[in-house]
């Protein structure tokens, strides 16, 4: 059975465009005939503070709002979300569904801790580093 719904969690730092990217993704889904909802989450700080945004994508109507606890896809906009723990959700892969995807904005692979590596392997997570 094909997946009819995707939950995307985006994490980065203030000023990187995490919220803008979630709006673009959500609007693209709606324009193409799908259903989408998004919820940005950030503090009162301006730049370099943790930012998360949650996008739900579905072929059917969406009634849920709020934080996505169990995403299919995690997008990391800055390596420090992982290396310095600059995220509201730690460790960064928390809740990722089995067979999930993690896209990291970096030109070279990030050295994960043993616990992070084990957590990703247990879930059969595909990690992509995209510069």
Give the predicted meaning of each segment.
Residues 1-131:
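Active-site cofactor/cluster-binding pocket
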